[in-house]
Amino acid sequence: MKKNRYIKKALSWVEKKPTKIVKSIAEGYEDPKVFTSKSTNEKIRADLSFTTYGGAKHYSDIALKNNNAKKLVVKWKVLSFMAGMKRGKLHLLAPKGHKAFTERLVERHNINALVHTI
């Protein structure tokens, strides 16, 4: 999986934040929560999730260019909605060369997310 190349950078980005609990798909961390669509039975999981000391729950996803943009949009909308319910945000971590693609999708589909470069 290409995301494994960027997971350490993403973890160091999260660890700079004032966090209480960090969950990640990386080895040595508890896995983030998996959301399952009732209609399609598709599973959605963030690459990272963290809780701040105020109790807000944030989700982070490593945003890579993908031929299946619709699937990314659905995933990001679900994660954004779930983060908003817990007073948090969706953070899309875009490696160099992927930021413009990510920003275009976020803007075009009106996704409530913050795009960061890692």
Task: Tell where the protein language model's regions lie, with residue ranges.
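Structural motif
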Residues: E27, D61-N66, L93-K96
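Domain-level recognition of nuclease-like catalytic cores that cleave nucleotide substrates
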Residues: L93-I118
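Arginine/glycine-rich "motif VI" loop of SF2 helicases in the C-terminal RecA-like domain
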Residues: S80-R87
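Active-site metal-binding core of divalent-cation-utilizing nuclease and nuclease-like domains
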Residues: M1-I7, K20-A56
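Conserved catalytic cores of phosphodiester-cleaving nucleases, focusing on short active-site segments
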Residues: A46-L79
